[in-house]
Structures are given as C-alpha cells and as structure tokens.
C-alpha cells in the first residue's frame, strides 16, 4: 500500500478498513489534550479527533503503520518540547485498533489511556498521567512528572520517571521493573498471578507492596533512612539505626522481590486469601469517588480507573 496522508484541522472521524493489510503499528504524538487507545478484535482501525487547537494533526497511513501527530514533533527526541512556545496546541484523539498491534504514544502535557492491547506498548510523557488497562504485551513507560497507573496488566512492565508515581492494581505480569528519583511506588499483586520478578528503585519515594497470602518470593527490601513495616512472619527485619532491611523467603521462593529506597519508607502488606477485590474498603469507610476507565475510545477525554487505595490485613511489624 502506498503512503496516504491527511491534515486534520478540526473534529473528524476516519476509518482504515483494509483486510489485506490491517494496522499492526500505531504511533501517536500530541501536545496537551487526551489520547485514548483501545484494542479490538476487528481488522479495521478507527480514529476520532474530537477537538484540535493550534496546527492541524497529520495522519499518515504507510502500509501497516498508522501515525497521528505533528510534522514538527518527532517520536525520537520529543522530550525537547519543553519550550513553552510548543505548548500552544491541543488535541483530543481516540483510536480503536486491532488488539495485536504495537502501540507507541508520546505526549507533552497530555493524558493517555491505553486498554486491551496484546502487542507491545510504549508510552513516553513529560507531565501527563497515563492509565494502562488489561495489556497483555510488554509495556515500557517513561515520564518526567506524570504518574502511571496500570490495572490488570499481564505483560512485562518497565517504568522510569523523575517524580512520577507508579500504581499497579491487580498486577499479574511476570516482571515489574521501576526506577524513580522521588516518585512513590504502590503495587497490589493479583493472587492468581504466576511467580513475579519485582525490582523497584527510588531515591526518596515511598514503596508499598501488597502480596497475596500465601506468597511465593525471595524478598530483599532495604532503606537507608526510612521506616520499614512487614506483615509476613517468615520475613525478618534487621537494622535499628541507619539501613534497615526486610529479608527472607515466602513459600517456595520462586519469585523475586527487590525494593530499594534511600530516604523513603518500605511497607510489605498482606492480602488475605479470601479477599476478592484489591484495595477493598475497611468496614465503615466510604469508597472513593471516581469512574472506571472507559473500555473504548470516547469523543472527549476518557476517565481513568477509580482512584486506588491500599490496605493490609493481619499483624504488621514496623521499625522506625
């Protein structure tokens, strides 16, 4: 298929229906606004641009690759777009693509929701928050100040940020690797998940991990000056002054959990075996307000999953 290009200066809907060569790669690059991507079982791809402010969006179909962005905002090196002059634009973009497609999203000041993708997902952002829902393929996310929330992600998850927070709900992937300078990290693991390799590193951020009970992992968590708390009797807390550690083996030790922070606190929480939803409210507490993420593209920015909250059960040992 030859390359086709469209300039989109305002609201518009486009359908890319080519059964012989469906879209297998999606690239989206926007400044401000919202990006919503949902995977479907259809062979066609659909684009809905709800609003455009500033220069028009450029839509390009080159074979199996669909690109939405600006001529002056390349995928590589787009973090250079910290010049305020480049922020005088905005777009709300929603896409439905085959679930097996690879998805790349780059945004400056924009928020993104990606759901239902089985291919590779890569998200790069400066200040916008990102929500990932039910992704089965490998995921890589990079951010400066934007937060990342991943819900029911079963693929490998890698996250890097300067000050953005990481929240994982119903985590069921085989590997989670996260690095941050000051961002907090909150993980709640799905009790049905296979053995997981978790490696978390932050300088001043706090780390909280809720594991199913019984759990199956070799644990090594340490902080130089923060507090530590542990809800598992099989784990040992050592160190009273300076560096504190939580070490030991849970179950057969098939998984790995390593967490390191310099000045932040570390908490290992336990979910009872019979607890069903993650972060369930304790009796008497009011549930947080918020709407769940939309399962499909919406003309106006889709809302992200309900705000998360953590909880633990059982006795907790804490060292200050």
Give each language-model segment a name.
Residues 1-143, 147-320:
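Intrinsically disordered, low-complexity terminal regions
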């Amino acid at each position: 298929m030859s390359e086709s290009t469209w300039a989109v200066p305002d609201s518009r809907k486009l359908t890319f229906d080519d059964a012989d060569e469906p879209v297998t790669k999606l690239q989206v690059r926007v400044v401000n606004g919202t990006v919503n991507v949902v995977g479907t079982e259809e062979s066609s791809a659909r684009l809905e641009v709800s609003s455009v402010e500033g220069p028009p969006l450029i839509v390009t179909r080159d074979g199996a690759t669909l690109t939405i962005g600006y001529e002056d905002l390349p995928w590589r090196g787009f973090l250079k777009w910290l010049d305020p002059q480049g922020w005088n634009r905005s777009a709300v973009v929603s896409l439905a693509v085959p679930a097996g497609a690879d998805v790349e999203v780059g945004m400056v000041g924009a928020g993104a929701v990606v759901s239902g993708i089985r291919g590779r997902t890569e998200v790069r952002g400066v200040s916008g928050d990102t929500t990932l829902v039910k992704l089965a393929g490998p995921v890589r996310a990079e951010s400066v100040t934007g937060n990342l929330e991943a819900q029911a992600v079963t693929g490998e998850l890698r996250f890097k940020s300067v000050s953005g927070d990481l929240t994982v709900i119903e985590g069921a992937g085989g590997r989670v690797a996260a690095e941050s300078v000051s961002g907090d990290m909150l993980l709640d693991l799905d009790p049905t998940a296979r053995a997981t390799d978790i490696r978390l590193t932050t300088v001043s951020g706090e780390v909280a991990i809720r594991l199913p009970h019984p759990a199956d992992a070799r644990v090594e968590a340490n902080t130089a000056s923060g507090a530590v708390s542990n809800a598992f009797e099989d784990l040992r807390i050592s160190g009273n002054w300076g560096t504190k550690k939580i070490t030991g083996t849970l179950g057969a030790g098939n998984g790995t959990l390593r967490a390191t922070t310099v000045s932040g606190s570390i908490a290992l929480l336990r979910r009872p075996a019979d607890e069903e939803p993650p972060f369930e409210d304790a009796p008497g507490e009011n549930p947080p307000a918020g709407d769940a993420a939309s399962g499909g593209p919406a003309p106006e920015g889709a809302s992200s999953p309900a705000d998360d909250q953590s909880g633990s059960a059982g006795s907790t040992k804490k060292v200050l």
